[in-house]
Structures are given as C-alpha cells and as structure tokens.
Amino acid sequence: KVISVGNITVGGSGKTPLVIYVTNLLKNSGYKVGVLSRGYGRKSRGYKLVSKGDEILTSVEECGDEIYHTSIECKVAAAVSENRVKGAKKLIEESEINFIVLDDAFQHRWILRDADLVIIDQSFVNTKDFFTHNLLPAGDLRERFESLKRSDAIILNRKFLEKEEINQEMKKYFEEKKIYTAYYKAISFVDVMRKIEYNLDDFKGQESLVVSGIADPQSFLNILNKVHVNTQNKLIFRDHKNYTLKEVQQIR
C-alpha cells in the first residue's frame, strides 16, 4: 500500500506534521510503515537508509532535517532517495514494511499510490489576489489548481482561523473531493533535551527569546501570542537552515 502526502504550493502548508500524523495513524493501526523522502537540503546523494525504526542510522546533514525529525517522532523505517522508484524498492528490501508514506510526492507520477493527500494553507486559498499567483520560479505555485483533480482528499489547514472557509471562486476545484480540516493548538511547552513538559501558563508574560527556523514563522509566533508568551525578542531564521557556531552561541 502507498499513500502520498504533498502540496501544490511552496513551503509552510503543514506537510511534515501531516506526514507524521498519517504515519503514526497507520503504525497504531497495525501496519508496518516506512517513509520515503527525497531528503530536501541534504548534503548527500543517492539512497540513504535513515532509520529502521529503533535507531537513527545517519546524520541530519546526510538525510535532511524533515525526514530526520519524522524518523524521531514516528520511530519507523525511513529512507531518502532522489529516485523514488529505486528508493521504494530498496526500502522494501531492507525493512519489513507493508505500507509506504511518500513525503512530498504529489508531483511525482512514477509510483502508483492508493491515495493522494494534498494539504493546502487556507490563507493562501483565500488570498484576494490568489489568481495572480504564478508558477515557480515566478510565483508560489508548483502546479495549477486544476491539478487537484488528481487528489483523493484535500486537507485544508486553517491553522488559527476560526472556521473552514473556501473562496467562492475556488469551490469548483474542491467539488466531489473529500475535504478535511486541520488546525494548530498549543498543548504544552517541552524541554526536548531533558524531556520535561511545562504548562502553557508557566511562560505566560515572561521575558522570552523566541527562535524560529521554519517556512512560515508567523504561524509559530501566532501560537505563542495566543498563549500570552512575550515574542518581542526573537530570532527568525530561514527554513532548513544549517546553523553556524556563532548563531548557536547567540541563541544560548
């Protein structure tokens, strides 16, 4: 069985959290799941086995930060390969899996899949000048919205918007599609090194240094503002950044 998780826009749609959610859902349902990614931003080429589930077998530099994070969160077999067909075959050979989640594969046509899931940021859909968006490299679109007809289900990520809303002009692209809604909700703060969990109120109003290194930093800042964390002092870095020693020292 194969499920593809992808999008039609550049960055910030919530694809990696959806990959983690789908993978854990399948794993908890009894499937032996493997995740295959191209390994965006990695410093290696070819096929790399990232994890067999119980341990990470490579460095974040060799596989890329997204699949590295997914492997830690899901504890399933995972691999990277720019050739998805060869990568899928090798991942099946090297691990006892019966289900593959293809990360960021909506534009890839060479592997037959049982379901194509596409996640879209609702704010992008509702932008008034939406139809002026251009295809890469001139704009934000990987492909036209007409391509959604290939999808089996669409996940509308409303993030912090109060309700699901689709622009009237856009509704024709969503007809006869299964539409699901995703949103963000802060639950707690976690010290990942010491594995200590803190209540949201523990940081309420305190002076903080906020560090972000994701495609859509505003969504992260919105989370903190919603739980009354002071975000005045912040360091905003680009997505997939390799941090220098000077930057790490600055954060500390």
Indicate residue ranges for each PLM-predicted region.
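Anion (oxyanion) recognition and catalysis
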Residues: 27, 72, 225
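Conserved beta-strand elements of the Class I
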Residues: 34-36, 118, 208-211
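C-terminal accessory "lid"/substrate-recognition subdomains
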Residues: 125-252
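Short phosphate-binding/catalytic loops that engage adenosine nucleotides
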Residues: 31, 75, 229
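Walker A (P-loop) phosphate-binding motif
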Residues: 1-54
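Phosphate/Mg2+-binding loops and adjacent switch elements
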Residues: 40-42, 46-174
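Signature of alpha-helical transmembrane segments in polytopic membrane proteins
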Residues: 1-3, 109-112, 187-189, 194-196
